[in-house]
Amino acid sequence: MHFTIQREALLKPLQLVAGVVERRQTLPVLSNVLLVVQGQQLSLTGTDLEVELVGRVQLEEPAEPGEITVPARKLMDICKSLPNDALIDIKVDEQKLLVKAGRSRFTLSTLPANDFPTVEEGPGSLTCNLEQSKLRRLIERTSFAMAQQDVRYYLNGMLLEVSRNTLRAVSTDGHRLALCSMSAPIEQEDRHQVIVPRKGILELARLLTDPEGMVSIVLGQHHIRATTGEFTFTSKLVDGKFPDYERVLPKGGDKLVVGDRQALREAFSRTAILSNEKYRGIRLQLAAGQLKIQANNPEQEEAEEEISVDYEGSSLEIGFNVSYLLDVLGVMTTEQVRLILSDSNSSALLQEAGNDDSSYVVMPMRL
């Protein structure tokens, strides 16, 4: 194997592919990236046995075919440290990878390509083409609510639900829930649900960088595959039953608060400074036309904000984890937001004013 390539052409796919590779591995070959040269195409593959990412680069010069695996992070760090306009010469010589650029030379250890595992792919049962920017927005609006290392392993991921002409994403950690829907060219009559693991969702979002580009999604029995121009991403699915999110969405809340998103966000952020560092509780006191936000901590320090809101119902006092409210306001984009409440023991429903494609549920806190 022998090829030459510009630093820039190699670095972008290498960084994305190396992002999948875990630092601590049980199998040494999983710390490596698989390099394959065929014709005038170089492909780079990284995997952790759950998620696999393949990047493809066209080579400008004729190349000698071959395949080998090399330490992903070391190769990436070498590329990063070379000058921007460097031309990199890479070849395999006696089980070592020789990397040359200008007056720099590196010799890396290798492992045989045969040792490199591939993610098993069954047949796909459903295929659709989506705009990258729309799918990225769907993920960005919901991924913050995914659980991390929850024993309920099905919460450490995102539910993707396809039905006729609609793709919906839902995530929850048991304390809050995020839901977003987008229209999509899907010819599926009945609802089909899959759970994509947390790491898979975050890596997929990193791929969706082309505002004009499309991404092809294939859903199989045990895997999801996404293909863009230069990359193919495959992830195993989580085998589990996601909670019935429609039962979680509060119904019949009679107290509607409409407020300025940025003003609320700033007031919550300031109040949060003096909330309990562990529990992050703040108290909301609603009265006609105004919202009072209070926080205090074990050191007897207190913060209070008053903010004008559009509200005409009876007075109400309710507690929340301020981080959860800030996360929601952080992904919204409209000027005005709606907060729908019923009583101090019921969850709040947050939505953008004038936009129904996203809904957020936050459970209250006892203060």
Curated annotation (Swiss-Prot):
Gene3D superfamilies: 3.70.10.10, DNA Polymerase III, subunit A, domain 2
Stored InterPro entries: DNA_clamp_sf, DNA_polIII_beta, DNA_polIII_beta_C, DNA_polIII_beta_cen, DNA_polIII_beta_N
Primary location class: cytoplasm
Any one GO BP annotation for this protein: DNA strand elongation involved in DNA replication
Keywords on record: Cytoplasm, DNA replication, DNA-binding, DNA-directed DNA polymerase, Nucleotidyltransferase, Transferase
GO cellular component, one term: cytoplasm
MF terms in GO: 3'-5' exonuclease activity; DNA binding; DNA-directed DNA polymerase activity
Localization per Swiss-Prot or TrEMBL: Cytoplasm
Assembly mode: Forms a ring-shaped head-to-tail homodimer around DNA which binds and tethers DNA polymerases and other proteins to the DNA. The DNA replisome complex has a single clamp-loading complex (3 tau and 1 each of delta, delta', psi and chi subunits) which binds 3 Pol III cores (1 core on the leading strand and 2 on the lagging strand) each with a beta sliding clamp dimer. Additional proteins in the replisome are other copies of gamma, psi and chi, Ssb, DNA helicase and RNA primase.
Cited NCBIfam families: dnan
Sequence similarity: Belongs to the beta sliding clamp family.
Function according to Swiss-Prot or TrEMBL: Confers DNA tethering and processivity to DNA polymerases and other proteins. Acts as a clamp, forming a ring around DNA (a reaction catalyzed by the clamp-loading complex) which diffuses in an ATP-independent manner freely and bidirectionally along dsDNA. Initially characterized for its ability to contact the catalytic subunit of DNA polymerase III (Pol III), a complex, multichain enzyme responsible for most of the replicative synthesis in bacteria; Pol III exhibits 3'-5' exonuclease proofreading activity.
Protein name: Beta sliding clamp
Organism encoding this protein: Pseudomonas putida (strain ATCC 47054 / DSM 6125 / CFBP 8728 / NCIMB 11950 / KT2440)
Encoding gene per record: dnaN
